Regions:
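N-terminal Rossmann NAD(P)H-binding glycine-rich loop of SDR-like oxidoreductase domains
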Residues: 2-30
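Glycine-rich Rossmann NAD(P)(H)-binding loop
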Residues: 13, 173, 204-211, 239-246, ...
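NAD(P)H-binding glycine-rich loop region in Rossmannoid oxidoreductase-like domains
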Residues: 42-98
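Conserved Rossmann-fold NAD(P)-dependent oxidoreductase catalytic core, especially the SDR/UDP-sugar
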Residues: 74-76, 94-144, 164
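Active-site Tyr-X1-5-Lys
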Residues: 138-169, 174
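Glycine/proline-rich active-site loop of Rossmann-fold NAD(P)-dependent oxidoreductases
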Residues: 159, 171-189, 219, 227-239, ...
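A conserved pocket-lining segment of Rossmann-fold NAD(P)-dependent short-chain dehydrogenase/reductase
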Residues: 188-216
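Mid/C-terminal beta-alpha module of Rossmann-like enzyme folds, strongest
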Residues: 222-307, 319-321, 325, 342-349
Length: 352
């Protein structure tokens, strides 16, 4: 345990995800030493020191993490899926516990940052109080984000390091190959509609069309996460992190259609997952004719998270003012975020 260490050393769990990859880039740009953590080798982490470990196994975690005596900050954005919300609790709390307790034993920790989301407010269950605030009471029912924070805050008592939790809205990212990338799902859908001479029909219900939603740019989220990890004002606090604006799909969707130069059409329920499977051969032909980087649309995005989002027929937004009052000043116009991501997808030959 090096108590004289001055350089910040980040251990990032979930480094290959849409949140983790941007966070790694931001940390490196700010002269941090970064170590990735992964259950399986990832091609996205080739230029990063990586510890491969299954955090569900306490013994394996302790052995694999024992050499990391120089780690100062843990950034935790990993998660394990399961058949239902209740079954997600035990493995996800176990993974966090095995990581934090192992590093706490060997290193002089400063901060543990936990990535959460609006599920702590019951957003996944149905209509909930909006804007959601960090001071809102908990929600009955098993949910791993809340269970993780309960464990972390209890474990930290009496220790010198501090924790923080960040709670983004729907994250906007340029990372392909991840189901959680809504912007890419929309871009693929729009590209298919364009190639089939179809209008860009809103894929949700009329209620979803009129609902309010907020978003979080991955770069802004990384900046806020770094700020929270290094600011005394964030000690043992949770923060909603959003772009600072809210939108109705009825306002945003026509702007997206205009960007793709497609006619906008009224809501009809469309499953992105079903469409991407049904039009897999259409995408393959489009990719070949336009010389796109990936000819298999399902390797880019499976549409499942998009279907989840477009089933929200209720408002989904949080109050981001606590973060700004504490000292973080970042903002992002959501429409411009989407347009920038679409340009990046096009530049990378992901969409035509």
């Amino acid at each position: 345990m090096n108590t004289l260490q001055t350089k910040n050393v980040a251990l990032v769990a979930g480094a290959s995800g849409i949140v983790g990859r941007q966070l790694v880039n931001t940390l490196l740009q700010n002269d941090w030493e970064v170590i990735g953590l992964s259950r399986n080798p990832s091609p996205h982490l080739q230029n990063l020191p990586v510890v491969t470990v299954d955090l569900r196994d306490a013994g394996q975690a302790a052995r694999a993490l024992q050499p990391l005596t120089h780690v100062t900050h843990i950034f935790y954005s990993a998660w394990l899926n399961a058949a239902n919300w209740a079954e997600m609790v035990e493995p996800n709390v176990t993974m966090l516990r095995n990581l934090v307790s192992s590093i706490d034993t060997v290193a002089s920790l400063k901060t543990v940052s936990l990535m959460q989301g609006y599920k702590v407010y019951g957003a996944h269950l149905g209509p909930f109080k909006t804007p959601a605030r960090e001071s809102d009471p908990g929600v009955a029912g098993a949910e791993f984000n809340a269970a993780q924070l309960t464990w972390l805050s209890d474990y930290q008592l009496g220790r010198l390091w501090r924790w923080n939790a960040v709670r983004p809205g729907v994250v906007g990212s340029n990372v392909p190959g991840n189901t959680m990338n809504l912007a890419l799902s929309i871009a693929l859908y729009a590209s298919l509609c364009q190639s089939l001479n179809l209008p860009l029909r809103f894929p949700g219900s009329p209620q979803t069309w009129g609902s309010i939603v907020d978003f979080t740019d991955a770069g802004l989220l990384a900046d806020a996460t770094l700020w929270a990890a290094t600011s005394p004002a964030a000690s043992n606090q949770a923060f909603n992190v959003n772009n600072g604006d809210v939108w109705r799909w009825a306002e945003l969707w026509p702007l997206i259609a205009r960007w793709f130069e497609i006619e906008c059409a009224p809501p009809v329920r469309v499953s992105f997952e079903r469409m991407f499977k049904d039009y897999r051969s259409v995408w393959r032909e489009l990719a070949l004719s336009k010389r796109l980087a990936e000819s298999d649309i399902l390797k880019l995005n499976d549409g499942q998270f998009a279907d989840f989002v477009f089933r929200w027929d209720y408002d989904m937004f949080g109050d981001g003012s606590k973060l700004r009052r504490a000292g973080f000043r970042g903002m992002q116009a959501t429409d411009e975020m989407f347009f920038r991501l679409f340009r990046q997808f096009r530049a990378a030959r992901i969409i035509p």
